Structures are given as structure tokens and as C-alpha cells.
Swiss-Prot record:
Its EC number is 2.5.1.16. The active site is at 164 (proton acceptor). HAMAP family: Spermidine_synth. The gene is speE. Keywords: Cytoplasm, Polyamine biosynthesis, Spermidine biosynthesis, Transferase. This is Polyamine aminopropyltransferase.
Length: 289
């Protein structure tokens, strides 16, 4: 770890015109991978953070808002999720949350960047909490697009697919995984009652990109849910889009969600049945013109 010899400020862009200033106290690792710049640092307000190409991906003090909201609505919507695929999520927290469900027999995490996974394993233990070593988990270092195409050819199927990728507007790495055509491929590797969920960036600052993702999901799934959660270290509300082939997340009552979590042995810090109800009934923020 390198102590910062003076005040260093991360300038995190929220849009082309607005930025968030974050004080950094110490830097643990800086590495330029073949795909992106990776920084792991300690911040004043958000604790340890993973930064990819100037964007905070996760922070110790608020990552549960993000990861629990990404994972559990989809997992709770499915009555018996056994096989789970995660695209992205290199710090291991999405894998951690999925593995909390006692129904899960197999969880495959596919990330294109080996360096993110290895640095997260070394410097972000609070994120993964040993999930990489769970016997039900398999970590694959591969382009998610290629993995899905190979899964189609192999006839591999999943109950829940969780897309924890970089934003559709922040870099070129994941853009092809947000298209209508890719969601058609996702549908082909889901079981007949499967569920997919993706983070979709921010609808306020990037409405066109958000709409692209939303239309891609709507074109391929009969049941669609939009929801969002404020993430302090991001400086904005993160949007999520859930697509389902059979089960409607809007139909779940708080007591049904809580009972599914209890039966599966899931312990959460943020997500509950009442939170699920709130997520499914909140407005999506856009600029009011």
C-alpha cells in the first residue's frame, strides 16, 4: 500500500458536464490491463474502492446497496434457481450474493479481465468473502459474448443470468453485451422459466443508452421490470432491468420474498421483501423537460 503524500482527488465523471470529487487517502494497486486501468484505493468517505477507467465500480461502505439490488430481485423471482451465470462482476461480490441462495448448485462467473479478478482476490476480501473458492463456483476468464455463443452451441442452460458489466457508455468493453441481438442470445441459454437481470447505467444522464438496453430486454422477454437504487459512491441512482420468461417480480408480496430468503438461508443488509416491493413500484428518473 502506498500512502498518498498529499491530498489526491479522484475526478469521477457523472456525465460530460458533471463530475464527482472523491478524496483518496491511500493507493493499494494501479495496473493497466489489456482492457482497462484498474485502481484499488482507500477513500475518505467510501472506504476501499475498485476503480475502472476513472469510474468507481464498488466501495466497501455501500456495495451491498448495489449487489443485493442487482442479484436478489431476480433470484427471489425464480422459485428454484439452481444454475446461475454471472457476466462480469470481477470483484466477486455478485457471485457472493448469488451463492447465498441455498438452491444454487452451480454459479459460473465470466469476466474478461483476469487482472480485475486477481487484484480483487488480493485486495478486496470484504467484497468476495471467499466466494471464488466456493465449490459451487466456477470462474472463467473469457469474453462474455464468446462464452454465451459457446454455451448456445453446447446447449448449456441457466435459471438466472446476472449481467454485472461496466456501463454501456463508460467503455467499449461491454457495449456489444447490451444490444437487442445479445439479449436474444441470452434468452437461448435460459431455461423456459428463466430470468435475466442487468445493470443499465443511469437513465438521467444517459437516457439514450438506457433506452437501448431497455428495448433490447423488452424485445426478448414478455415480462420486464425497471428499478433503480441510489449509490452514494457513484453519485447517482443505478438503473437495473429485469427480464423474465414466466415469473413476474411485480406479483411477489413482501412476505413471499421474505419467506424465500428465509427458506434459502439468505442474510442481507439491505434487500428485504418490503425493499423488493418498493423497487418494483418506484419511478425511473429522467430529465424533466
Amino acid at each position: 500500500m502506498r500512502k498518498v503524500p498529499g491530498p489526491i482527488t479522484l475526478i469521477e465523471p457523472l456525465s460530460g458536464n458533471t463530475s464527482l470529487l472523491i478524496k483518496i487517502n491511500a493507493i493499494h494497486s494501479v495496473k493497466k490491463s489489456p482492457y482497462q486501468e484498474i485502481i484499488i484505493a482507500d477513500t475518505e468517505d467510501y472506504g476501499r474502492v475498485l476503480i475502472l477507467d476513472d469510474y468507481i465500480q464498488s466501495s466497501y461502505v455501500d456495495e451491498q446497496y448495489y449487489h443485493e439490488s442487482l442479484v436478489h430481485p431476480a433470484m427471489a423471482t425464480h422459485p428454484n434457481p439452481r444454475d446461475v451465470l454471472i457476466l462480469g462482476g470481477g470483484e466477486g461480490a455478485t457471485l457472493r450474493e448469488a451463492l447465498k441462495h441455498g438452491t444454487v448448485k452451480r454459479a459460473v462467473m465470466v469476466d474478461i479481465d483476469r487482472d480485475v479478478v486477481e487484484l480483487s482476490r488480493a485486495y478486496l476480501p470484504q467484497m468476495h468473502q471467499g466466494a471464488f473458492d466456493d465449490p459451487r463456483a466456477k470462474v472463467v476468464i473469457q469474453d462474455g459474448f464468446v462464452y454465451v455463443e459457446e454455451a448456445i452451441k453446447a446447449g448449456d442452460k441457466y435459471d438466472v443470468i446476472i449481467m454485472d458489466l461496466t456501463d454501456p457508455y463508460s467503455s467499449d468493453i461491454a457495449k456489444q453485451l447490451y444490444t437487442r441481438e445479445f439479449f436474444a442470445k441470452i434468452r437461448r441459454i435460459l431455461n423456459d422459466d428463466g430470468v435475466v437481470v442487468t445493470q443499465a447505467g443511469n437513465s438521467f444522464y444517459f437516457p439514450a443508452e438506457y433506452d437501448m438496453v431497455l428495448e433490447g430486454v423488452k424485445a426478448n422477454f414478455p415480462i420486464v421490470a425497471e428499478y433503480e437504487v441510489w449509490i452514494p459512491s457513484f453519485g447517482y441512482a443505478v438503473n437495473f432491468i429485469l427480464g423474465s420468461l414466466r415469473y413476474d417480480p411485480h406479483a411477489l408480496t413482501p412476505s413471499e420474498v421474505d419467506e424465500r430468503l428465509r427458506a434459502r438461508g439468505v442474510k442481507t443488509a439491505f434487500y428485504t421483501g418490503r425493499v423488493h416491493l418498493a423497487l418494483m413500484n418506484m419511478p425511473i428518473h429522467r430529465k424533466l423537460r
